[in-house]
């Protein structure tokens, strides 16, 4: 139990033991529609810029998107349970990467990396 006091006011806050972990991972699977090939860091930079443009620096820090892998014009973005919705909302905002036209289409969200790999065609 945590106790905060401010002069005459006292606030009691109980920690809930069975509360779900808010840092649980989520994996967003997306399609890359483009004639060109891109590196992982180029796509990650574009995703981070679009999240920052849509939600600001706070949502960028909360969601912390990372592109894990790309395979056959499909990719996986790792994020947490708090920020996966802003990533899904910001993917269609990406129109160009390195002055080449591209469209990123979110397909599915899953909770395990193994399932995400299976959905993009690995294993």
UniProtKB/Swiss-Prot annotation:
Keywords, sorted A to Z: Cytoplasm, Endonuclease, Hydrolase, Nuclease, tRNA processing
Enzyme class: hydrolase
Major localization listed first in the record, in broad terms: cytoplasm
Domain of life: Archaea
One Pfam family it belongs to: RNase_P_Rpp14
Keyword Glycoprotein: no
GO biological process, one term: tRNA 5'-leader removal
Keyword Translocase part of the UniProt annotation: no
EC number(s) reported in the record: 3.1.26.5
Reaction catalysed by this enzyme: Endonucleolytic cleavage of RNA, removing 5'-extranucleotides from tRNA precursor
Subunit composition and interactions: Consists of a catalytic RNA component and at least 4-5 protein subunits.
Protein family (similarity comment): Belongs to the eukaryotic/archaeal RNase P protein component 2 family.
Record's protein name: Ribonuclease P protein component 2
Species name: Sulfurisphaera tokodaii (strain DSM 16993 / JCM 10545 / NBRC 100140 / 7) (Sulfolobus tokodaii)
């Amino acid at each position: 139990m945590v106790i905060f006091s401010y002069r005459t006011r006292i606030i009691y806050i109980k920690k809930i033991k069975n509360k779900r972990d808010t840092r649980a991972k989520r994996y967003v699977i997306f399609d890359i529609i483009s004639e060109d090939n891109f590196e992982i860091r180029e796509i990650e930079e574009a995703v981070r810029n679009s999240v920052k443009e849509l939600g600001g620096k706070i949502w960028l820090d909360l969601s912390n998107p990372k592109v894990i892998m790309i395979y056959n014009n499909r990719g996986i973005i790792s994020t947490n349970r708090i920020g996966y919705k802003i990533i899904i909302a910001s993917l269609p905002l990406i129109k160009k990467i390195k002055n080449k036209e591209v469209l990123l289409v979110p397909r599915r969200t899953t909770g395990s990396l193994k399932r995400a790999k299976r959905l993009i065609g690995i294993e």
